[in-house]
Amino acid sequence: MSRFVSAALVGAALLVSGNAFAYDAAAGKATYDASCATCHKTGMMGAPKVGDKAAWAPRIAQGMNTLVSKSIKGYKGTKGMMPAKGGNAKLTDAQVGNAVAYMVGQSK
């Protein structure tokens, strides 16, 4: 029983700290190329271009969990919009998170 309680406490601590998810930027490149580059390479619909540090800085400051959540659920802001899962409903949440990690890594 004590192992279960310990595991539950560790899991809860990870969720609260925001580090419950690990993203794989290398795996995210394939998803970016297939599903994200159309907008994030050109700036279509106000999407921040990958590599544009000034455009990405305030987004990165929100934290990965916020960026990934908005990318999964969709978001409409004053500078543009992000359709849920980039408009590709077949993407898994993990694929979206990995693609976001790739874009963030290229934009720091």
Curated annotation (Swiss-Prot):
Could you tell me which species this protein originates from? Chlorobaculum tepidum (strain ATCC 49652 / DSM 12025 / NBRC 103806 / TLS) (Chlorobium tepidum)
Signal peptide start-end: 1-22
Q: Which Pfam families match?
A: Cytochrome_CBB3
Cited PANTHER family: CYTOCHROME C5, PTHR40942
Any idea what this protein is called?
Cytochrome c-555
Listed GO biological process terms: photosynthesis
Sorted alphabetically, the keyword list is: Electron transport, Heme, Iron, Metal-binding, Photosynthesis, Signal, Transport
Task: List positions binding heme c.
Answer: C36, C39, H40, M82
The cross-references to InterPro entries, in alphabetical order and at most eight, read: Cyt_c-like_dom, Cyt_c-like_dom_sf, Cyt_CIE
Query: What is the annotated role of this protein in its UniProt record?
Result: This basic c-type monoheme cytochrome has been found exclusively in the green photosynthetic bacteria, although its role in bacterial photosynthesis is not established. It has an unusually low redox potential compared with mitochondrial cytochrome c. It is reactive with cytochrome c oxidases but not with reductases.
What's noted about post-translational modification?
A: Binds 1 heme c group covalently per subunit.
Record-level Gene Ontology MF annotations: electron transfer activity; heme binding; iron ion binding
